[in-house]
């Protein structure tokens, strides 16, 4: 503001206008900066969302791929084992389990030397870290082969579904995971179908039933404990496979020797048959592949899912089993029960593997003894 010589009072607005222009420019810069930051935040948020979606898609593919790999491996070894033990009348399922242990040790040992796989070296506390998996692993293998030898494949497949219920209960108790209502309904339907099929088993074999039920309990324990060890131990899936086989080799060899199975197997007259030898070696190698696929499937899925996928492959095994081995006796009630169990397996597969937009949520429960499914 200034006074003119003529005595008139006038206002000099130029400084005020200049200050206003500066303020407007500062405000525009702030607004522009805020908009830029907002766009940057929106861009980074969309990138994070896109990255998360890619990770979810990759995990989904791994879940499906590992489940299919396990199902195919389980199907192949069931058919090959049945051919060796029943069609060729190989006398010792214990010796066959020893061959499968040997194949796992040799393949993984060579793989580590060639740096194809990696796992920690043997230490004094290695056995304690993976216990009780070696015992479960050996028992599951031996009793599973025993059940395969003594029962027809359709009945073996039906009775194996009891392992699903056992796995579900163990997951609740040990891992604190409660299955959804749809999962529970499908599991109970599978068990009901298996019971219906077993009620009219015309080729009943008590020893085979005992073998399979022991295998069911061990399969459930194996799946749950593998999941637990993979989450809490640095040994990894290759280490679990290798040390399970390594620690149980000598006990399995001693058991073969004491029971006379070693002599029976070595004196088997079909060793000159090249087709049988190929089948036997394939059974040994498939034992290793099955162990790997089981751990891989359990790593990317739940132990219950791994168990159900193993039973889903029995859709093919059930019908092929009517012709493989020649020891299946057909009845309508048995067939209806088997198909109910198969349909329930398909229901569980749909419930478990359907793709969801939101991440799967599991209820973690306190490990109390009073909880029931």
Curated annotation (Swiss-Prot):
The keyword Transmembrane helix applies. GO terms for cellular component: Golgi apparatus; Golgi medial cisterna; Golgi membrane. The modification Phosphoserine is found at residue 50. It is a multi-pass membrane protein. Residues 27-49 are annotated as: Disordered. It is found in: Golgi apparatus membrane. Keywords: Golgi apparatus, Membrane, Phosphoprotein, Sugar transport, Transmembrane, Transmembrane helix, Transport. GO terms for molecular function: antiporter activity; UDP-galactose transmembrane transporter activity; UDP-glucose transmembrane transporter activity; UDP-glucuronate transmembrane transporter activity; UDP-N-acetylgalactosamine transmembrane transporter activity; UDP-N-acetylglucosamine transmembrane transporter activity; UDP-xylose transmembrane transporter activity. GO terms for biological process: compound eye morphogenesis; embryonic pattern specification; imaginal disc pattern formation; imaginal disc-derived wing morphogenesis; nucleotide-sugar transmembrane transport; segment polarity determination; sensory organ development; UDP-galactose transmembrane transport. The chain crosses the membrane at residues 89-111, 131-153, 174-196, 206-225, 238-260, 275-297, 302-324, 329-351. The keyword Membrane applies. Involved in the import of UDP-sugars from the cytoplasm into the Golgi lumen. Belongs to the TPT transporter family. SLC35D subfamily. This is UDP-sugar transporter UST74c. It comes from Drosophila melanogaster (Fruit fly).
């Amino acid at each position: 503001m200034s006074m003119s010589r003529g005595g008139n009072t006038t206002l000099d607005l130029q400084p005020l206008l200049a200050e206003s222009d500066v303020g407007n420019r500062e405000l525009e810069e702030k607004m522009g900066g805020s908009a830029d930051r907002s766009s940057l935040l929106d861009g980074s948020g969309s990138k994070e969302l896109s990255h998360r979606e890619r990770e979810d898609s990759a995990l989904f593919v791994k879940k499906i791929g590992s489940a299919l790999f396990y199902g195919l491996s389980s199907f192949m070894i069931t058919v090959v084992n049945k051919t060796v033990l029943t069609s060729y009348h190989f006398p010792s399922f214990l010796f066959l389990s020893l061959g499968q242990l040997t194949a796992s040790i040799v393949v993984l040992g060579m793989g580590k030397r060639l740096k194809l796989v990696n796992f920690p070296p043997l230490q004094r506390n290695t056995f304690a870290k993976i216990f009780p998996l070696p015992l479960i692993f050996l028992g599951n293998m031996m009793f599973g082969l025993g059940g395969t030898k003594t029962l027809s494949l359709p009945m073996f497949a039906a009775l194996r579904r009891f392992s699903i219920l056992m796995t579900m209960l163990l997951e609740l108790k040990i891992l604190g995971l409660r299955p959804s209502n749809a999962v529970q309904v499908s599991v109970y339907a599978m068990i009901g179908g298996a019971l219906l099929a077993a009620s009219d088993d015309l080729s009943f074999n008590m020893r085979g039933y005992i073998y399979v039920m022991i295998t069911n309990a061990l399969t459930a324990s194996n799946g749950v404990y593998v999941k637990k060890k993979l989450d809490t131990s640095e040994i990894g899936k290759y280490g679990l496979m290798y040390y399970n086989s390594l620690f149980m080799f000598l006990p399995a060899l001693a058991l073969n020797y004491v029971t006379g199975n070693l002599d029976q197997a070595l004196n088997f007259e079909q060793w000159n048959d090249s087709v049988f030898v190929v089948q036997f070696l394939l059974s040994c190698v498939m034992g290793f592949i099955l162990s790997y696929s089981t751990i891989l499937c359990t790593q990317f899925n739940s132990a219950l899912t791994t168990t159900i996928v193993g039973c889903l492959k029995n859709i093919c095994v059930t019908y092929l089993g009517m012709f493989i081995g020649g020891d299946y006796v057909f009845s309508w009630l048995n067939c209806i029960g088997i198909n109910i169990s198969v349909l329930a397996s398909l229901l569980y597969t749909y419930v478990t593997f359907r793709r969801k937009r939101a991440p799967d949520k599991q209820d973690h429960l306190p490990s109390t003894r009073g909880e029931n499914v």
